[in-house]
């Protein structure tokens, strides 16, 4: 991998800022609060000049880590990335203020038994997220995070829940990355059939992603999950759950690799229930983490 550093500039449309301001002035209090939540989410997720980079969702970042640069497809042996991408979708919806975990109540129910409930049905503009949001909105009674990961993956024995499966997720995410200029599209022949692949076309974007993950557990390690950027914390967990985090650490020397993996294991060994109960914790994150480690 070419580890050269750089910036990928994107145009910032003036109407986006203007639209946000106009919405705050003209809409109802609920709309205003939602707009404020969205703006706060963007501020939380953009640091160190990320506004000048190609913006990727958690799903796109995990898929990009899993794709082979030249071949343009994920490992045939990776059977974890499918459910991992569904976990990304739930966390994205949580970070964008669309869903939340119900309150623990007087009985202090655990994360794994509490339901995922709708917070706002305002569309995100991302087709996959909005499709999942629609399913969550139409489901009554609500389901747990673990159940939703299974339903969205199509890994359920309940035939009535198969309609919730999100289909062709990897291909749809790859097309998003093609539109953003990160990947390209090719046809490759595999003996008896042709296969659409998506080789890397912008090495800078992937290098920045890999470096960002490496820095989070090395030079920028804070040793406190509550102080970590929530999106980066989610990316580390979900990359591990999707069995692609090794691709981010492969370029490291032996000493740095050992330190990085040790710190990832420290995160995996946390008490998720205790972390979710701390002030300002995002319960969606910890509920998804628990679903993948139970």
UniProtKB/Swiss-Prot annotation:
Q: Which domain of life is it from?
A: Eukaryota
One Pfam family of this protein, by short name?
GPP34
**Region Beta-hairpin required for oligomerization: start-end pairs:** 186-197
Q: Which InterPro entries match?
A: GPP34-like, GPP34-like_sf
- Which keywords, in A-to-Z order, does the entry hold? Cytoplasmic vesicle, Golgi apparatus, Lipid-binding, Membrane, Phosphoprotein, Protein transport, Transport
Task: Look up the record and report any one GO term of the cellular component aspect.
Answer: trans-Golgi network
Specify which residues bind a 1,2-diacyl-sn-glycero-3-phospho-(1D-myo-inositol 4-phosphate) according to the UniProt entry for this protein.
77, 86, 167, 170
**Name the record gives this protein:** Golgi phosphoprotein 3 homolog sauron
- Say which species the protein is native to: Drosophila melanogaster
Q: What is the lineage of its organism?
A: Eukaryota, Metazoa, Ecdysozoa, Arthropoda, Hexapoda
